[in-house]
């Protein structure tokens, strides 16, 4: 990463082409092909930003990864019986390798910008670097503290895909590198249907599976662009500007939201700022969805709704349907976000009071923000993964029959604990218990079918230790603390628990990718 900084610290006359020379470095492609790095964006603490990192260990990692890739490519070439067939796909192979390396390179300036932003915030507020805000679970306590006094929520599905040329223009406003812009346009030609107004979903799926890092970078750059305009209008229309959520957003998302915007926005949108006078407003985005919560009338929420539709249609040239934006009442409609169903509740508390000889009752309405587990999508995910039928009845996992007993149990336990860990914040644990029951019985049936036995005989042979494998860490700890008072531990376990160590839960939230959990 020291070489990265050398390229980024060039003088003004050379800084316009700081990305292009990195394309000729072999270690860039070694890093791009490393499977550990492909699962997520580059971590700031593991690639050289931390002073404690060893440059020698990084060089060894790059060399080892590069040698492994050479062996993989040689084995593919040796096992291919048709050399012409292999040569015919060289162009696609080279394009794939180049795009993966390019995805690593374009992240560098934004990662350095994020580091400098966090350092400035730490100096201003004299606060230590906290990793708790990186957790996805930190959003829900924020909901509980701030959403209880709000009324309406604007539930938005962010439109995709967008026109490729819009992505190029967005990237052009950040990086003054003509060579990189031409290369980006070339990659978009490869993956997208350039002639159509709306990109087909097949191109998106191919792009996402072939180069997820590059796809996520383009998606986040698109999100940054419209959020910059949105936050600008939000700050200009309110005298009570929010400062508490700035650091939270910066640490959750890899790409920082820069506060300096072009002054032309003020000239273009000055006439419509009076439409959005709302001092209490909260915005949260994750993956392809965002929510906008406010304490105001439905009229104002409708204005925001049509503003967002016009912004995407006219500024980003995206066909946006009104059905992708829903105005929900916080205390009447559920909000499906981050794998939870959230809703506000009004709990009435009756208090008897007496003053002198007169006694009267006072009804206090306590507002509470509840989060529950969506059982139907999870049942559907288990059905797709062949753990149960559409009715939720457990079935055996036939594809794992060739594995050893310990390996089968370990895979079931891992899925069960991951789901319990993430959904521990649910207000009602009955749905979570049902999911755990399906996985436990499916494990029984898979082992029974493998050994051609019955559930009763097989369970008697394994004993109760087999059931303890499915206990979560919380249940183990509570059973140790309260070994004799089991009812106390069960009562404590029924409470909601939010964890601040859950950083990457894409596969847990996205029910269509449930099968990935078992790998």
UniProtKB/Swiss-Prot annotation:
Keyword hit for RNA-binding: yes
Residue ranges that the Swiss-Prot or TrEMBL entry lists as coiled coil: none
GO molecular function: RNA binding
Keyword set, alphabetical order: Chloroplast, mRNA processing, Plastid, RNA-binding, tRNA processing
Cellular component, GO annotation: chloroplast
Compartment list: Plastid, Chloroplast
Entry function: Usually encoded in the trnK tRNA gene intron. Probably assists in splicing its own and other chloroplast group II introns.
Family: Belongs to the intron maturase 2 family. MatK subfamily.
Protein name as catalogued: Maturase K
Species: Aesculus pavia
């Amino acid at each position: 990463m020291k070489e990265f900084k050398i390229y980024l610290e060039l003088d003004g006359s050379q800084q316009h082409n700081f990305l292009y020379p990195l394309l000729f470095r072999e270690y860039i492609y070694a890093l791009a092909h490393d499977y550990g790095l492909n699962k997520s964006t580059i971590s700031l603490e593991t690639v050289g930003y931390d002073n404690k990192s060893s440059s020698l260990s990084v060089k060894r990692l790059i060399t080892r990864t590069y040698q492994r890739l050479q062996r993989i490519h040689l084995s593919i070439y040796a096992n291919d019986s048709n050399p012409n067939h292999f040569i015919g796909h060289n162009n696609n192979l080279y394009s794939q390798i180049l795009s993966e390396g390019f995805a690593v390179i374009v992240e560098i300036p934004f990662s350095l910008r994020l580091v400098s932003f966090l350092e400035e915030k730490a100096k201003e507020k004299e606060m230590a670097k906290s990793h708790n805000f990186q957790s996805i679970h930190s959003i829900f306590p924020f909901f509980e503290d701030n959403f209880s006094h709000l009324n309406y929520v604007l539930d938005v599905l962010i439109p995709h895909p967008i026109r490729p040329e819009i992505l190029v223009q967005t990237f052009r406003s950040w990086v003054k590198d003509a060579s990189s812009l031409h290369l980006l346009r070339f990659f978009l030609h490869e993956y997208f249907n350039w002639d159509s107004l709306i990109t087909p979903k097949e191109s998106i799926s191919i792009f996402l599976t072939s180069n997820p890092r590059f796809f996520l970078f383009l998606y986040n750059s698109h999100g940054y662009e419209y959020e910059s305009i949105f936050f600008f209008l939000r700050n200009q229309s309110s005298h009570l500007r929010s400062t508490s959520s700035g650091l939270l957003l910066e640490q959750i998302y890899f790409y920082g939201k820069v506060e300096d915007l072009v002054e032309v926005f003020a000239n273009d949108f000055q006439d419509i700022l009076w439409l959005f006078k709302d001092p209490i407003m909260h915005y949260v985005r994750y993956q392809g969805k965002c929510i906008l919560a406010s304490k105001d009338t439905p009229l104002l929420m409708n204005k925001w709704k049509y503003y967002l539709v016009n912004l995407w249609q006219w500024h980003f040239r995206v066909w946006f349907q009104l059905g992708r934006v829903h105005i929900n009442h916080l205390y009447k409609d559920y909000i499906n976000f981050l794998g939870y169903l959230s809703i506000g509740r009004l709990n009435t508390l009756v208090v008897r009071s007496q003053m002198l000889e007169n006694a009267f009752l006072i009804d206090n309405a306590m507002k509470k923000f509840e989060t529950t587990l969506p059982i139907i999508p999870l049942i559907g995910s288990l059905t797709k993964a062949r753990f149960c039928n559409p009715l939720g009845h457990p079935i055996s996992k036939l594809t794992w029959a060739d594995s050893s007993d310990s390996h089968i149990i370990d895979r079931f336990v891992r899925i069960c604990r991951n789901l319990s860990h993430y959904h521990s914040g649910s207000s009602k644990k009955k749905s979570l218990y049902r999911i755990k029951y399906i996985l436990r019985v499916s494990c029984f049936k898979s082992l029974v079918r493998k050994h051609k036995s019955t559930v009763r005989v097989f369970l008697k042979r394994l004993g109760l230790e087999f059931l303890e494998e499915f206990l979560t860490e919380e249940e183990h700890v509570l059973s140790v603390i309260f070994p004799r008072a089991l009812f106390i531990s069960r009562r404590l376990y029924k409470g909601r628990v939010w964890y601040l160590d859950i950083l990457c839960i894409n596969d847990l939230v996205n029910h269509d990718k449930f099968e990935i959990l078992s790998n």
